[in-house]
């Protein structure tokens, strides 16, 4: 058995983008046991993944995590975060390891000065660079997203007008530059001839109410427990941030 630790602390979109590599690790390495270290608030994204055997949650004490991880005696560590915390963990474990080309400076040039020298390589394929030494290759089966049975939200519980299909629109985002203004969202919604469910968190309630008032709508949800199921069942899923 080969025991492998994958480090990815955040965030939702980036975590989902790690799933092809994790699946291929599990399926292409015989008797592989896959562990993940991630932030506590994102742990459920990995806990529902059948290709992962164990999830370690980082909250406040990286020292505690390191002490626990040392006991696992990993055969290999895959750093998909590549920041100060993940490097600290990798060095402390002292096991064979690899990372991926993060290209931070190139991303800075693109986002700040609009100078695009980014390679034409998808981030998923860049993640696979970290496991080349293990002879793991992309199977091109796409991303994985697994929903816990306890979060299943039957469409029958929605109003009748939603049961023949609906669109879902995520109105929040990690950064202000990734959040569409309510007026712009309302403009989009007015062009849609299907019922729409607005999705977000507690910080998005006020924004949702403004959007509803602009389009004369009646319903919204900010319940994170059912967001994933609503996204999955929607005919069209729109967002401005990565999800």
Summary of predicted features, one role per range:
Residues 1-243:
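Catalytic machinery of carbohydrate-active enzymes
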């Amino acid at each position: 058995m080969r025991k492998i630790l994958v480090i990815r602390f955040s965030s939702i979109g980036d975590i989902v983008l790690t799933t092809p590599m994790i699946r291929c690790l599990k399926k292409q390495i015989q008797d592989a046991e896959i562990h993940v270290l991630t932030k506590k608030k994102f742990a459920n994204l990995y806990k529902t993944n059948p290709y992962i055997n164990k999830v370690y949650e980082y909250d406040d004490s990286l020292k505690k995590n390191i002490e626990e991880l040392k006991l696992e005696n990993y055969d290999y560590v895959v750093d998909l975060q590549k920041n100060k915390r993940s490097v600290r963990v990798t060095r402390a474990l002292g096991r064979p390891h690899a990372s991926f080309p993060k290209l931070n400076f190139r991303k800075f040039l693109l986002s700040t000065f609009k100078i695009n020298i980014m390679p034409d390589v998808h981030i998923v394929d860049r993640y696979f660079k970290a496991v080349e030494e293990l002879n793991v290759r992309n199977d091109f089966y796409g991303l994985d997203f697994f929903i816990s049975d306890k979060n299943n939200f039957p469409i029958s519980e929605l109003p009748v007008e939603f049961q023949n299909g609906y669109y879902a629109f995520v109105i929040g985002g990690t950064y202000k530059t990734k959040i569409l203004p309510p007026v712009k969202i309302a403009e989009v919604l007015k062009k849609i001839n299907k019922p729409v469910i607005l999705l977000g968190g507690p910080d998005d309630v006020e924004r949702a109410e403004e959007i509803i008032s602009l389009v004369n709508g009646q319903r919204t949800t900010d319940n994170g427990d059912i967001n994933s199921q609503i996204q999955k069942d929607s005919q069209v899923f729109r967002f401005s941030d990565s999800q």
